Amino acid sequence: MSWSFLTRLLEEIHNHSTFVGKIWLTVLIVFRIVLTAVGGESIYYDEQSKFVCNTEQPGCENVCYDAFAPLSHVRFWVFQIILVATPSVMYLGYAIHKIAKMEHGEADKKAARSKPYAMRWKQHRALEETEEDHEEDPMMYPEMELESEKENKEQSQPKPKHDGRRRIREDGLMKIYVLQLLARTVFEVGFLIGQYFLYGFQVHPFYVCSRLPCPHKIDCFISRPTEKTIFLLIMYGVTGLCLLLNIWEMLHLGFGTIRDSLNSKRRELDDPGAYNYPFTWNTPSAPPGYNIAVKPDQIQYTELSNAKIAYKQNKANIAQEQQYGSHEEHLPADLETLQREIRMAQERLDLAIQAYHHQNNPHGPREKKAKVGSKSGSNKSSISSKSGDGKTSVWI
């Protein structure tokens, strides 16, 4: 008998099964197929020819052999191997078809998009050079990356090793795998019970037959009963071992699935998932939460640069007070020191303005001085009024 075809099919099952399933496959090939093909046929080849009965009645010996062995041991075990391996072969065909279909679908998707891109953020160096402030700002912009480069990066990363269970689950074959495992277990139990009712646990050395056309009870003798009994017990042990492996594999799948679900929940609690933002092409921008300060225009240098800067600062302070208001808890402790510093700053500002007008208009210094004096008086009165009201603006 040639077993090469079935052996090649079972080798393909080896590539789509768990660690326990591979052990079961080894037991099936080594102990069942090899023992049945080599040992069984050599032991039972003379089973009917050496079955001798003490009668000369024609046809009585054949009828007694049929009563002794309704089904030959070797044919029973061959039938058992075929039926037990059938669910695995059907699972293999389904798995190959589904995996090929998935690969074909992925190939069509890759062909549909010629050069897909993946977006990643990168810093724009040209923007930094144009600012001329020699400061690193986290200006980011989305950069397109070829999908092939992304796949090469993913392939370079080592994948975690597993025993085949995760691969079966990722391919969507877990349900059909469990179904074929249950069918295989049912066949094992059925053949184990049938073997017990057909042959028992021992091959007796003689058999008493009383069937027609035998004239009376006759004794029939079996060749090599001890050898056949040992081989029968070995096949019982192999069947029981395969049944235990099936139960072990079911427990392995059950506990493994529970462990994976618990680990996934733990990872979700420890590491919150990243947010998936839709792809949009945006102009270079700063990350969220980063305050961008616009660089002010350059002020041409003049003799009144300090005065203009002070005027702009005072204007900004007034605008800030109008927007946010002021609170009494932010007032400085020493108001007299603050007023003294304000008067000194105002005097320096008056001197600078007088010097500027004296250089540009030497004929009318008195009129300008009078205007400046009136202006400074109004400013001092406004300062004193604001200080008395509890405001926190500072004039420079």
UniProtKB/Swiss-Prot annotation:
Entries under PANTHER family matching the protein: CONNEXIN, GAP JUNCTION GAMMA-1 PROTEIN
An example Gene Ontology biological process: AV node cell to bundle of His cell communication by electrical coupling
Organism: Rattus norvegicus (Rat)
Biased composition (Low complexity): 373-396
Protein name: Gap junction gamma-1 protein
Chain ranges on the Cytoplasmic side, renumbered to this chain: 1-18, 97-175, 251-396
GO molecular-function terms, A-Z: gap junction channel activity; gap junction channel activity involved in AV node cell-bundle of His cell electrical coupling; monoatomic ion channel activity
Segments traversing the membrane: 19-39, 76-96, 176-198, 230-250
Chief place where the protein resides: membrane
The encoding gene: Gjc1
Disulfide bond entries: none
